[in-house]
Amino acid sequence: MKIQHVLIAASLVALSGLAQAQVDPLHVRSWAASCAACHGTDGRAQPGMISLAGVPKEVTIQKMLDYKAGRMPAATIMHQLSKGYSDEQISAIAGYFAAQKN
C-alpha cells in the first residue's frame, strides 16, 4: 500500500511538471496582444516607446517581476498590468517576445 502511494505521488509530480512546460501558444499570443497598444504588434513599437521584439527572455522577465513587486517606478501602467499575470504567464510572454524579430 505504501509503495502505491509513492508511485501515485511521483506520477502526480511528473505530470504537473509536464503541464507547466506545455503552455498553449494561442494563450500566449492572447496575453502578449495586451501589450500591443503601447509596445506594438508582436513587440515592434513605434518611435518613442520601448520595443519588446527580440529582447532576451530573462531581461523581460526581470523587468516584469520588478514592476509586479513594486521595484520599478509607477510612472506607467506596467505595475498594474504585471500584477495580472502569474510568473508562468510572464515567462511565456517574455519568451514570445524574445522569439520575435525586431
Label the predicted regions.
Residues M1-I8:
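Bacterial N-terminal signal peptides that target proteins for export
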Residues R44, P73, Q100-N102:
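Inter-heme linker and motif-flanking segments adjacent to c-type heme-binding CXXCH motifs
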Residues V28, D42-R71, Q80-Y85:
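Gly/Gly-Pro-rich "capping" loops immediately C-terminal to redox-active cysteine motifs
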Residues V13-A32, G48-I50, D66, K101:
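Electrostatic cytochrome c docking/interface patches
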Residues A33-T41, I93:
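The canonical Cys-X-X-Cys-His
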Residues K83-N102:
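C-terminal capping alpha-helices of c-type cytochrome domains
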